[in-house]
């Protein structure tokens, strides 16, 4: 019986991890509220001389039509040099640009940051010859989100 339970746990755990990986998002937990995390991220974007496009507060928009939504914000930002390089590899990646970072509160009240995994975009758009740019974008996204989420 213990062997069956252990086997099921392993199988279900593997299935769960696959489902998480397949959605193409990287998600980390923040030590701050959604709003504070998004504020910190926006400041980091500006400090790095990236292009800040806009910030969308979906919860505020929901409240405007008398609906409720846990805190949910999106920041659109980018770097025209990196974005252009990616689009030159696969023009269809433009549908996923500029970069987006999602700041949200889960059902347990924990603040999270999610963003598109650049390597998932590579696969999704059949990108060739952009590994160096993808590596830089991936590293930058990881650093920005970690800094915004840290105490």
Language-model features, listed with the residues they occupy:
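Positively charged n-region of N-terminal signal peptides that target proteins for export
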Residues: 1-7
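Cleavable N-terminal signal peptides
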Residues: 7-9, 19
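Terminal, regulation- and interaction-focused segments at domain boundaries
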Residues: 21-50
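C-terminal partner/receptor-binding element of secreted or periplasmic proteins
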Residues: 117-151
